[in-house]
Amino acid sequence: YTEVDTLSLHDALPISSPWQGVLAIMLALYLVFAHVDDVVRRARAYGQGFFTGLRKLGRAYWGMVSAHCGLAVMVAGITLVSFHEVERDIRMGPGDRASIGEYAFVFDSLDNYQGPNFDSTRGHFQVSYQGEPVVILHPEKRTYHASGQIMTEAAIDAGFWRDLYVAMGEPLDDGNAWAVRIYFKPGIRWIWLGSLIMAFG
């Protein structure tokens, strides 16, 4: 494979981001642990056993705890995405490889297929982490029959700690290469998880 782009996660970040990110994460953790400590103290204050005390804390109190802990999780997610997200626009063709940190993206091949109401050019990207296979992503460029509109369908590998995205832009060199956009988004799911926890509160 031909290496067309290599970027370490450290080089992709602003100089100030590590300290700001660490501070935000520490504040989020402090908020969670402070509420855990408060729950334990209040439950024990009833003097009737820890689990009995938990049941007596009341819905309003649990709602407040859930809302604040959800906020902490959401802040942690926003911090990770804001300071550690990486986006790369790269010229790639079949056989090319690009790396972001320990993740390698290999443009393996292209094929064409016909959907129910569109024609598609589909890419096949092998993704590995520290040399171990992770997933094969299949971004598409679709042309819809009725309108003639061309749409980009990004391929996503979603995970608890990070999401990986690959999207195909415009063909280059008569289709021998493509403008490819690769995203590394850490903690993006934490934003939705935190919002969900807050909603329960």
Model-derived features: where do they sit?
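Solvent-exposed, non-transmembrane regions of integral membrane proteins
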Residues: 7-201
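Short, exposed "boundary/linker" segments that immediately precede the start
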Residues: 1-6
